[in-house]
Amino acid sequence: MNYTEFFTNRSTSEISKDLLGRTLSYNNGEEILSGTIVEAEAYVGVKDRAAHSYGGRRSPANEGLYRPGGSLYIYSQRQYFFFDVSCQEEGEPQGVLIRAIDPLTGIDTMIKNRSGKTGPLLTNGPGKMMQALGITSRKWDLVDLNDSPFDIDIDHKREIEEIVALPRVGINQSDPEWAQKKLRFIVSGNPYVSDIKKKDIKKNHGFI
């Protein structure tokens, strides 16, 4: 798949929005674990106070953001790991964080990996999603998507009723401008979106 083209040549916000409805899958060597992407956040580089590359910060820890579009940037916070894909040309450190998936295949294994958690608690957040997939290290950090056990189906996507743009989660409120920027994109009404209220959940999970 031409991930480089998909993850470049347009804004990172557009890329993040376009990921919604597409299938993210992981081959663990025994089976394919997969789900529909329902929540993604854009991080727009050196000007973005919430980005790991803000101000041009560059280190071995965030090098993935500086790689060509379609490279993996996997990082950890506490015991959790997070799945980012770099966007834009090499040296332009922007990326998209996949925050949640609506599970499709390998669900029993996901439940086991999440110690028995079921329903939305299975994958309704970036750390939970990676735990459900069984990712417990940064092994695939810096690797091109094409050379990894991960796959994003850029040729097909589910039809979505409505995409909503919201402020990102966990952003430092000391900078109101960036804290309130609507760079998080969700499938409206999907129960696996990380902070959705029960009254807002749709029976069709927001798909047509």
Swiss-Prot record:
Disulfide bonds: none annotated. GO terms for biological process: base-excision repair. Signal peptide: none annotated. InterPro entries: Formyl_transferase-like_C_sf, MPG, MPG_sf. Its EC number is 3.2.2.-. Pfam families: Pur_DNA_glyco. Keywords: DNA damage, DNA repair, Hydrolase. It is an enzyme of class 3 (hydrolase). GO terms for molecular function: alkylbase DNA N-glycosylase activity; DNA binding. This is Putative 3-methyladenine DNA glycosylase. The lineage of its organism: Bacteria, Bacillati, Bacillota, Bacilli, Lactobacillales.
